[in-house]
Amino acid sequence: MKPNINLGDKSKFVAWGTNGMKNCLDHCKLILKRHGLTEFGISSKMYTLLMEDGNKLSYACNNPKEMYEEAINCIDRHLEAGRPIIVGVNHTFGNKYNDGTTDHFVVIYGREYDGKHYNYLYYEVGKTNVAAGFNDKENRFVYDTTNPDKPQFYDEKSSRSDQARFDVIQVRPNY
């Protein structure tokens, strides 16, 4: 079993609209900067897990088990080295942001085991107040390997006003 890690720090959270910023990726980069990082979210080295396929998500490769394991290992390496990491999520079909699939970016800062799954804690940069954006109990992705050949990495009920599910579709290493 992997040890729990929590690098979260509410003083490092950047609320939506800080200094007039209205870009979630910029918010994520500022959070990483506050954590002492100088390189963050390198898109050329990202792991792509899912892609939109009409009104559903499909695995981005022929071997999703291997790709998810590599992406989770990347996240774990970052956390174990004391470095939070940016991930892209999908919450709405048909948005044409970024690569046509990523609707939003958040920063993973922790890992916990609940006896069944590993949960990854994240800063929700789309929030204007710290209590909602930095919430260990609510802002967490489940890494679900119940079906090992079809892993999932999601937050079933995000803190968005519509409580849309967040599916992690990209992992962006910091190096």
Predicted segments, located by residue:
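Noncatalytic regulatory segments and standalone regulatory/sensor domains
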Residues: 2-18, 38, 111-175
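Active-site-adjacent substructure of cysteine-protease-like catalytic cores
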Residues: 68-123
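Short, flexible/disordered intra-domain loops and linkers
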Residues: 60-64, 95-101, 132-136
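Cysteine-nucleophile protease catalytic domains, especially the papain-like/related folds used
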Residues: 1-74
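Residues that form generic nucleotide/phosphate-binding pockets
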Residues: 31, 74, 78, 156, ...
